[in-house]
Amino acid sequence: MSRSAAASGGPRRPDQHLPPAPCGASGPPETFRTESDGAGTMNKLRQSLRRRKPAYVPEASRPHQWQADEDAVRKGTCSFPVRYLGHVEVEESRGMHVCEDAVKKLKAMGRKSVKSVLWVSADGLRVVDDKTKDLLVDQTIEKVSFCAPDRNLDKAFSYICRDGTTRRWICHCFLALKDSGERLSHAVGCAFAACLERKQRREKECGVTAAFDASRTSFAREGSFRLSGGGRPAEREAGDKKKAEAAAAPAVAPGPAQPGHVSPTPATTSPGEKGEAGTPVAAGTTAAAIPRRHAPLEQLVRQGSFRGFPALSQKNSPFKRQLSLRLNELPSTLQRRTDFQVKGTVPEMEPPGTGDSDGISALCTQISSSFASAGAPVPGPPSATTGTSAWGEPSVPAATAFQPGHKRTPSEAERWLEEVSQVAKAQQQQQQQQQQQQQQQQQQQQQQQQQATSVPPMPTMAPTLQPFSTPVGPFDTAAAQVAVFLPPTHMQPPFVPAYPGLGYPPMPRVPVVGITPSQMVANAFCSAAQLQPQPATLLGKAGAFPPPTAPSAPGGQARPRPNGAPWPPEPAPAPAPELDPFEAQWAALEGKPAVEKPSNPFSGDLQKTFEIEL
């Protein structure tokens, strides 16, 4: 059977596997018919579920939809959702082929487009990022030279503009999301027309005329584009009409009741005038234009233009380098000076003046003690240690006379030098009198020291006096007496006896090893007026040539060393007769300080230790 079927030839049909059809039946079997009917119904159902695309109508055949765009452009509310492809430099300023090539170039770059919104107005074109709301492009309409849709891509639109900084031709390309490129190009054309109308209206209102010559190579312009009245033409027209009505109002309304009737006239007419003349101008003035987006707060802080701390700009800051690099003109220095002048009124009063002088005297004693501890002898402390009252009395008028009479100096050194110069001038006048008194006091001291014996505090000082055994004798009692009076306040006794020049007014003839800067300045001022013999002072630099005073030292502490045993028992009967010469000497010193006490506590008696020749 199979062989006969194979021999019968022909491919096997599907109906061969089916049971034989009844006699007289023709056509395909029933099952085949049902399958074909099911497939047809499914295709019909699938087609019914699909959304059919509307029939395409070209943009040129529906210009009625663009009329709303023109009004929106004039009002500044026209916008289109687009994808910003980017910008590329082009060689020509116009041409559809130039824009098409730019679109192809940007699409070939594969750069990701930015979903944004294109705002079209009479002012210009703005592209705002739809997600971050950043201003991507802000193009003035005057700089746009050409715009056109793409003939190859229905959604593409491009415009060519002049770059403001590099002066190159740049083409910006877009892909519209909902509209066509032709509609975007039409909106930009409306912006061109609105801008041109505004410019012509401005020229007409301002009265600007341009006269060209025959060759068209030059022109002369008359008038100005600047608005003399209000900032806007409509406001200026309304202001002119208000002025005219105000001028005509007094003539129309002579009585008091008339102004109330006339006054509503400008109020009622001006809004109408503004409404009539302002509706078309509103687009020109961009009253409803989109405000430009400002930088975020973080960017303002980063750029340094943040105004959250106004105190930094109000106060004078020393970090404002744009003011001046001179120290006297720095804001910090000026502020310090003004603060001193405000606070300086308190020391100028009489009661605080003494406290100020006491503070200065304490500072001076501290500085002098630091100099002495460092090994630089200070010649002047004994005159200061003769009594706190004697030192404070002359210093009070000096401080009170200095502060109100002068503006505050920038440094203490200038104040110091000024005081030293005053002292030097005073010393030149008082020098002759001091020399006479010094000679008399020298004779008195020599007589008293011959009669007097050593004082109990002296043995403690003896080890420091060994290098100066010969010259220290004449000044032992004086140093001891000072040490007895004021050792705790000024701490002078430990080092006063160690230097021969710390005694009394005969010091200009006695050499001293060290010198303070103030005395160097004082000596430089008064070196020309010094009448003392210079060789003695110049020899005193070495500190090993004090023998000129040795003959005047018959007794004192210089003799315990050579005589040995006989001298130690003598200090016991000495205290009783010691009081009378000491009191006499102290009285002589108290009568003297009014003449020789200067205002500068550092200078002391200002004896000349050596001369500086320049």
UniProtKB/Swiss-Prot annotation:
Residues 233-245, 409-418 have a biased composition (Basic and acidic residues). GO terms for biological process: adherens junction organization; axonogenesis; cytokine-mediated signaling pathway; forebrain development; lateral ventricle development; nervous system development; neuroblast division in subventricular zone; neuroblast proliferation. It is found in: Cytoplasm. Residues 74-223 form the PID domain. It comes from the Eukaryota. Keywords: Cytoplasm, Developmental protein, Neurogenesis, Phosphoprotein, Ubl conjugation pathway. Residues 563-578 have a biased composition (Pro residues). Residues 246-260, 371-390 have a biased composition (Low complexity). Coiled coil: none annotated. Pfam families: NumbF (PF06311), PID (PF00640). InterPro entries: Numb/numb-like, Numb_domain, PH-like_dom_sf, PTB/PI_dom. The modification Phosphothreonine is found at residue 279. Associates with EPS15 and NOTCH1. Interacts (via PTB domain) with MAP3K7IP2 (via C-terminal). Interacts (via C-terminal) with TRAF6 (via TRAF domains). The PTB domain is necessary for the inhibition of MAP3K7IP2-mediated activation of NF-kappa-B. This is Numb-like protein. It comes from Rattus norvegicus (Rat). The gene is Numbl.
